[in-house]
């Protein structure tokens, strides 16, 4: 059934056409035909070579209207910071017991935040957390002494993104049930941050393609004029 729905949705999209952002969002909402609240994603093809460290694009952005997803957060810290983390809304708070759980294969959260003083011990499980995108990192704000701020930002819709080996960067920007204007605002915030992070070493056209899609829908290409550099 999913294949049939996808084919029906694909038939409504001109794959060679680039839509205005507002029209692209409207099209994705129109063709999303699933029984659950589908996630809306944006993918950007960048003119960078991620094999070179000075062309890696990674960052974070606060989506004004959040992702629509309930994000589960683990804060790894010592006792002195535990109450602060809990009060800020962390779902799980602890230290050595969670490192042990992770060593045994547990990775049942969406985001892990850690204080700098536990990173030495957390390094023991870097090989488990890294491939899953869960390893705390100072650049993304997930290694910090201000755990309350970090937890609140993640819960409010802060997302992290990083260019992949093929030069693409993608991010969830909301749910198909969001009003169109909220999706447009979230997408614009994400694209502006990607633009801001253009590496000085990148040659040629930076933004080579943008597409918006939802779970089980084809990508709808977006006009790049406003986002080309």
Curated annotation (Swiss-Prot):
Species this chain originates from: Chlorobium luteolum (strain DSM 273 / BCRC 81028 / 2530)
Gene Ontology CC terms: large ribosomal subunit
Family of the protein in this entry: Belongs to the universal ribosomal protein uL1 family.
Annotated GO biological process: regulation of translation; translation
Protein name: Large ribosomal subunit protein uL1
Domain of life, per lineage: Bacteria
Coiled coil: none
Alphabetized GO MF terms: rRNA binding; structural constituent of ribosome; tRNA binding
Protein keywords: Repressor, Ribonucleoprotein, Ribosomal protein, RNA-binding, rRNA-binding, Translation regulation, tRNA-binding
PROSITE patterns given in the database record: RIBOSOMAL_L1
Presence of keyword Transmembrane helix: no
Subunit structure, as described in the record: Part of the 50S ribosomal subunit.
Stored Pfam families: Ribosomal_L1
Described function: Binds directly to 23S rRNA. The L1 stalk is quite mobile in the ribosome, and is involved in E site tRNA release.
InterPro entries per record: Ribosom_uL1_bac-type, Ribosomal_uL1, Ribosomal_uL1-like, Ribosomal_uL1/biogenesis, Ribosomal_uL1_3-a/b-sand, Ribosomal_uL1_CS
């Amino acid at each position: 059934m999913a294949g049939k729905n996808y084919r029906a949705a694909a038939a409504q999209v001109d794959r060679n056409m680039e839509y205005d952002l507002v029209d692209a969002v409207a099209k994705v909402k129109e063709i999303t035909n699933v029984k659950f609240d589908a996630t809306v994603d944006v993918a950007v093809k960048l003119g960078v070579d991620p094999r070179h460290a000075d062309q890696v694009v990674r960052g974070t952005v606060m989506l004004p209207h959040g992702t629509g997803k309930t994000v589960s957060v683990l804060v790894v810290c010592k006792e002195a910071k535990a109450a602060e983390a809990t009060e800020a809304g962390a779902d799980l708070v602890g230290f050595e017991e969670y490192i042990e759980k992770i060593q045994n294969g547990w990775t049942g959260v969406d985001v892990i935040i850690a204080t700098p003083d536990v990173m030495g011990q957390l390094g023991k499980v870097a090989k488990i957390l890294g491939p899953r995108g869960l390893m705390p990192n100072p650049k993304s704000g997930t290694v910090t002494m201000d755990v309350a701020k970090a937890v609140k930002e993640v819960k409010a819709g802060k997302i992290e993104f990083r260019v992949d080996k093929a030069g693409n960067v993608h991010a969830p920007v909301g749910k198909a049930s969001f009003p169109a204007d909220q999706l447009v605002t979230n997408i614009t915030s994400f694209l502006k941050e990607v633009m801001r992070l253009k590496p000085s070493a990148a040659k040629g056209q930076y933004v080579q393609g943008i597409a918006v899609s939802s779970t089980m829908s084809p990508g709808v290409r977006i006009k790049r004029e406003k986002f080309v550099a």
